A protein has these predicted regions:
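Membrane-helix entry/capping segments
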Residues: 1-12, 30-32, 45, 75-103, ...
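C-terminal transmembrane helical bundles of large multi-pass transporters
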Residues: 361-450, 457-460
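Hydrophobic alpha-helical transmembrane segments of multi-pass inner-membrane transport and secretion
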Residues: 2-34, 62, 66-67, 142-164, ...
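Membrane-proximal extracellular/periplasmic loop immediately following the first transmembrane helix
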Residues: 165-239, 244
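Intracellular coupling helices
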Residues: 19-60, 122-133, 400-441, 499-508
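"Rare, low-scoring activations can occur
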Residues: 1, 194-213, 277-281, 295-384, ...
Length: 509
């Protein structure tokens, strides 16, 4: 889904850039319309004018393509660091990639030059020399479509960025159902697996170690799920997957599990089980303590029910869990240790020293449970960084596109502005008049971008069982932010036209 989103965004930004380039080329060509008229009066055909326009477009696109390749090569280390990947230039040297680049370049050249070449080459020499701005039919509609498309891109991308940020914050602050802070775990290797109680007692002599527990798997990498559980009045066609977890009686203290019914397992309860709320809801009873479940030919008495916890992922669906005491060496693969908030580094050094003395082959690998769950957000963090980068590009493209539009408007309405100023109209009124179409285009774009981004991000959020609700306020914020950037860009360029001396504006060649 993320690859599809990136592809769609890349195409959207490329199309927006092409539309903006058309706007800029059109604005520039209007300044050369008399030059084209002179060419035609000297014998140039319409095809010659089209070739000239396309030659200019091709040169600009090729220079931009070469610059893009160089920027990509220079920025690749930064990009790899940004997304924690190792992409090299050999990937771009692939024959298929090169062919795709060439095709994109040719399409960009073809689309970028078609409007100015077709429209601005059709005038007669007399019309061109006189400056036939008013003869461009439907030009305003086309340029409005360009501006609206750029607004749609910017608003949609910024909305996506805000939604991703909100989802990441939601997952970061999600209640996992247990305490992951300052809990480290390590694998019990070699001799350590045969004497877990001795290791635990040794570690607990340190006052900065609050609790320790042997476990079959850490909650961040839970395995061993299976079917085959039986209970009274269970439907014959219902056989859910249940995660089977082993932990000693101190597990409830180490991870601060919350019991909602009964109590946690005690020493000697080898034929008892504790289940989570999700498993209890699948069973469907109103009371569980003391009742019996069966699996693999054994009966297990339910000692209690604990509140649901997140395992293996942050945004995944809650899974049914059954907890047993370790049975000999089975279920004692790891040990989890809860550390007090003071002197954490010294406590970690103490743990490593003791384990190295007991098992020389110990790899010195202590893993914070909190780091595991933080790492689970790496794909979302990478997506957030890339979408933010795309959004920055989109807003930059928006600013360039508006520059082209204002260049065109200022060129076309120079005399109109001069007449209005000579009749006493204030600069503020002139600026407001020229801003009005921009604001209208922004509002129309917001009406289109909002359902589009809402639909796409709703599709993306389906990746998560635990997710935020999309709020209309996000799209309002995105629209206001984009409009603010747009208005600032326009005001920077429009002030020159509005403050120009009306005598200079009305002077004809």
């Amino acid at each position: 889904k993320n690859i599809g989103i990136f592809t769609l965004i890349g195409i959207l930004i490329l199309c927006t850039a092409i539309l903006n380039f058309i706007n800029l080329i059109t604005a520039r060509s209007l300044k050369q319309i008399r030059e084209n008229g002179i060419r035609k009066s000297l014998g140039a055909t319409r095809l010659d004018v089209v070739k000239f326009i396309y030659s200019e477009v091709s040169i600009v696109c090729i220079i931009a393509f070469v610059a893009a390749v160089l920027i990509t090569a220079m920025g690749l280390p930064f990009f790899n660091q940004l997304i924690n990947k190792d992409i090299n230039l050999e990937t771009l040297a692939n024959a298929q990639v090169i062919k795709a680049f060439i095709v994109v370049l040719l399409i960009t050249i073809g689309l970028s030059g078609v409007y100015p070449a077709v429209v601005l080459s059709r005038y007669s020499p007399v019309q061109s020399i006189r400056g036939a701005f008013s003869q461009v039919r439907n030009g305003g509609l086309f340029r409005n479509a360009l501006v609206i498309s750029v607004f749609i891109s910017s608003i949609a991308l910024l909305s996506a960025t805000l939604i991703i940020n909100k989802q990441i914050r939601y997952l970061q602050n999600l209640d996992l159902g247990f305490e992951k802070e300052r809990v480290v775990y390590f694998r019990l290797n070699g001799n350590m697996k045969q004497q877990p109680n001795a290791i635990k007692n040794m570690l607990l002599t340190n006052p900065n170690i609050v609790s320790a527990s042997t476990i079959s798997h850490p909650p961040s990498a839970m395995g061993n799920n299976g079917q085959g559980w039986q209970w009274e009045n269970k439907p014959l066609d219902f056989d859910p997957l249940v995660f089977n977890w082993n932990g000693d009686p101190d597990l409830v203290k180490t991870l601060q599990l919350h019991m909602s019914e009964g109590s946690f397992l005690q020493e000697g309860q080898t034929h008892s089980v504790v289940i989570n709320r999700c498993f209890a809801q699948l069973i469907g009873w109103s009371h569980f303590t003391g009742k019996t479940l069966s699996a693999w030919g054994n009966d297990y008495q339910i000692a209690g029910v604990f509140e649901d916890i997140n395992i293996n992922s942050l945004g995944g669906a809650t899974q049914p869990i059954a907890v047993f005491l370790p049975d000999g060496g089975w279920g004692q693969n790891f040990m989890a240790v809860k550390i007090a908030p003071q002197d954490v580094d010294e406590t970690l050094t103490y743990i490593r020293k003791k384990l190295d003395a007991m098992e020389p082959a110990f790899i010195n690998e202590l893993t914070f449970l909190e780091d595991d769950f933080t790492q689970m957000l790496e794909p979302e963090n990478n997506l957030q960084k890339l979408i933010s980068l795309f959004t920055l590009f989109s807003i930059l493209v928006l600013a360039l596109g508006l520059t082209g539009m204002i260049m065109y408007m200022a060129e076309k309405k120079t005399k109109e502005i001069g007449i209005r100023k000579s009749l006493g109209e204030e600069n503020l009124s002139i600026v407001s008049r020229m801003l009005s179409p921009l604001l209208t285009a922004g509002l129309v774009a917001a009406l289109i971008a909002t359902p589009l981004a809402w639909s796409l991000m709703g599709y993306w959020l389906q990746n998560y069982a635990k997710r935020i609700d999309i709020d209309i306020l996000i799209f309002i914020q995105a629209t206001l932010a984009v409009m603010l950037v747009a208005c600032a860009t326009v005001l920077l360029h429009i002030s020159n036209a509005a403050t120009k001396n009306p005598v200079d504006a009305l002077r004809s060649e």
